[in-house]
């Protein structure tokens, strides 16, 4: 069956809008519905999974009502929700808008699956274009921008999607010339065409968002190439891997899969990429991305039932525009087409449930403390098995768009990212050495404010108004799909004009950072003992080169207390590491220490000879940001550094307040 270009474009646009909604909905689970590290992860996981389980009822609704009315209504709800989310309302309004858009998107996928037996071109195009746009937008989606450009582009995308959904005939196309709908081609057999491809929609969405087509992960991977020893720095051309990954994914997805032994390269590449990602090593991220991208595309191509005769059976509507296909929809399992449509609907609903299970299973580990490395490997294994399930491809036919030109066009879009989205701030000590340093320590909660909005502006202003020389950040997220796939560190560094050094804690993309307007040398990271804490912790040490041989050591950390205890063991480890690293030079240790003045963990720093730089302003509560009650964000300094003007800056751009202090350096 000839798959129409309009159907492919509409499917791709719908996928793009659904991913946009997901990037708002997923962070809302841990910032609005609940709070990471305080709300039980089981409760947040149940909330997330419930909507995907509910979507399993959609195929029955489609079979009873008919695909077209269900698809059109769901498309309208998805489009409206996506457009309204551009206002970034925050709070419960944002959460329920995104939830409505998500559920509508799932139902729309089921309805589309009932009428689309060759979804691979549309799915692949949607995933690839979304990744390219995400890269060009520097991982800040239109939803969070709110300016006239965001509204214009969002409105155009929504209008085109609704137009495609409303036009008649935007389905899987007519029967092949010379055949009737439902007729088998010579040498082929009837079956549920497209079901395997639809089953993979959810798993491919998960791995493309986490690994293969993640611009934030690509930039993070590039940042690990400049230092080594598990530390990352501001990279040159951080987005350069994105066009390569997009090209590899889209070209392999749209071209004829190899036969015989060549058909194994896709599953093998995908599995190797997933394993490299699961090893949690920053220096392996680029290889994981490129292998996973090519592997995902090749596996999708293996499920492209372009030669199946059932491609004609399902779309009787195309052969009978008068409307008998609608009757066929309502008769359900009495026809081959009805059974095939139902299989596709249940397949895509089940595949999206796999997406939810994988996402919840992977990210809940950071609250519950179990190993999660197997999750991406298991999802990759599922994709590989489905791709291998039926190796017979008889008379493969090209899709609606030429593979080479299509991949080239989307790659050209992605190539704009290194030009438009890559900024590299430069540090200099030409004006040094200074007499004073202003230090800011801030737990940025992955970039999300108390209302659940991705609030780069608020974070930037809270820091910038202190005119800092060095900024120490905690809870820095650089690519988690759960948080929308942003590289929050690079975004803040660009806006503050300060290069960064990053130390991984929970995994290669979540940890602590130091931003400095002075050159930084000798970065080191120390993994801290977990002692029962579910989330990993580390201490990142750097040396500020202030000019004329003047050096100051800075250590950024985020202590993770064991359940019901204080982070005493970690505090002692950080204090010992910092004192040894400084080796007599002036020293600053700061971050979210999860301990209060007078606690045993707090005493580990003072017992090591460090002074509380915020003493003059005590009590100085910093959490929660809207009603501060706890003093858990601190700055310690070595003797010889004289603190002044300590302050906790009022802001709700995070759930913590930033603390700042000015330090007078020892006389030279």
Language-model segments: residues:
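Active-site beta-strand/loop signature of hydrolases that rely on acidic residues for catalysis
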Residues: 14-55, 83, 240-241, 245, ...
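N-terminal post-signal-peptidase region of extra-cytosolic proteins
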Residues: 452-457, 485, 618-625
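Hydrophobic alpha-helical transmembrane segments in multi-pass integral membrane proteins
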Residues: 38-54, 71-74, 92-102
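Start-transfer (signal-anchor) and selected internal transmembrane alpha helices
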Residues: 1-9
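Metal-dependent phosphoester-hydrolase catalytic domains
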Residues: 2, 20-31, 45, 65-69, ...
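Structured beta-strand-rich core segments of catalytic domains in phosphoester-bond hydrolases
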Residues: 369-373, 423-426, 431, 451, ...
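Mobile, glycine- and charge-enriched loop segments
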Residues: 408-453, 585-586
């Amino acid at each position: 069956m000839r798959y129409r270009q309009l159907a492919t474009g509409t499917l791709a646009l719908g996928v793009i809008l659904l991913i946009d909604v997901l990037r708002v909905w997923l962070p809302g689970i841990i910032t609005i519905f609940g709070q990471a590290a305080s709300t039980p992860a089981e409760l947040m996981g149940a909330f997330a999974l419930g909507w995907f389980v509910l979507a399993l009822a959609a195929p029955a609704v489609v079979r009873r009502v008919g695909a077209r009315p269900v698809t059109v209504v769901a498309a309208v709800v998805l489009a409206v929700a996506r457009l309204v989310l551009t206002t970034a309302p925050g709070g419960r309004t944002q959460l329920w808008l995104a939830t409505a858009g998500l559920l509508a998107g799932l139902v729309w996928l089921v309805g589309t699956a009932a009428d689309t037996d060759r979804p691979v071109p549309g799915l692949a195009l949607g995933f690839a274009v979304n990744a390219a746009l995400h890269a060009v937008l520097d991982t800040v989606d239109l939803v969070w921008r709110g300016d006239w450009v965001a509204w214009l582009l969002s409105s155009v995308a929504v209008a085109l999607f609704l137009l495609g959904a409303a036009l008649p005939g935007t389905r899987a196309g007519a029967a092949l010339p010379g055949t009737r709908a439902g007729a088998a081609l010579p040498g082929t057999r009837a079956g549920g065409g497209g079901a395997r491809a639809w089953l993979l929609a959810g798993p491919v969405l998960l791995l493309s968002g986490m690994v293969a087509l993640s611009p934030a992960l690509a930039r993070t991977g590039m940042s690990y190439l400049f230092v080594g020893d598990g530390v990352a720095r501001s990279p040159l051309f951080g987005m350069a891997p994105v066009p390569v990954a997009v090209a590899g994914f889209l070209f392999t997805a749209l071209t004829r899969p190899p036969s015989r032994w060549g058909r194994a390269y896709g599953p093998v590449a995908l599995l190797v990429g997933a394993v490299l990602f699961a090893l949690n090593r920053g220096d392996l991220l680029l290889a994981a991305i490129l292998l996973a991208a090519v592997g995902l595309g090749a596996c999708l191509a293996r499920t492209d039932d372009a030669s199946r005769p059932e491609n004609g059976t399902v779309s009787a509507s195309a052969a009978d525009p008068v409307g008998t296909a609608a009757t066929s929809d309502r008769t359900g399992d009495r026809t081959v087409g009805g059974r095939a449509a139902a299989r596709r609907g249940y397949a895509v609903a089940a595949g999206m449930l796999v997406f939810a299970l994988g996402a919840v299973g992977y990210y809940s580990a950071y609250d519950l403390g179990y190993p999660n490395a197997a999750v991406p490997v298991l999802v990759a294994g599922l994709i590989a098995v489905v791709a291998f399930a039926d190796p017979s491809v008889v008379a493969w036919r090209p899709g609606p768009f030429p593979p080479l030109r299509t991949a080239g066009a989307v790659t050209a879009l992605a190539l704009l990212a290194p030009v438009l989205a890559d900024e590299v701030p430069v540090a200099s000590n030409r004006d040094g050495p200074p007499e004073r340093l202003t230090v800011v320590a801030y737990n940025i909660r992955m970039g999300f404010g108390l209302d659940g909005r991705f609030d780069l502006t608020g974070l930037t202003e809270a820091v910038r108004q202190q005119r800092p020389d060095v900024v120490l950040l905690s809870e820095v997220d650089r690519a988690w799909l759960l948080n929308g796939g942003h590289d929050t560190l690079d975004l803040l560094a660009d806006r503050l004009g300060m290069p960064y050094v990053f130390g991984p804690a929970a995994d290669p993309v979540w940890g602590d950072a130091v931003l400095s307007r002075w050159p930084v040398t000798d970065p080191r990271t120390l993994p801290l003992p977990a002692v029962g804490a579910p989330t990993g912790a580390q201490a990142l040490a750097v040396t500020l080169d202030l000019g004329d041989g003047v050096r100051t050591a800075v250590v950024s950390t985020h202590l993770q207390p064991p359940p019901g205890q204080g982070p005493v063991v970690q505090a002692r480890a950080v204090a010992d590491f910092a004192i040894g690293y400084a080796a007599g030079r002036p020293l600053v240790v700061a971050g979210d220490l999860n301990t209060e003045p007078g606690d045993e963990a707090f005493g580990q720093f003072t017992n090591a000879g460090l002074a509380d730089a915020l003493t003059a302003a005590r009590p100085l509560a910093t959490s929660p940001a809207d009603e501060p009650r706890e003093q858990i964000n601190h700055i310690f300094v070595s003797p010889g550094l004289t603190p002044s003007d300590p302050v906790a800056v009022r802001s709700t751009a995070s759930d913590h307040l930033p603390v700042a202090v000015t330090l007078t350096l020892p006389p030279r």
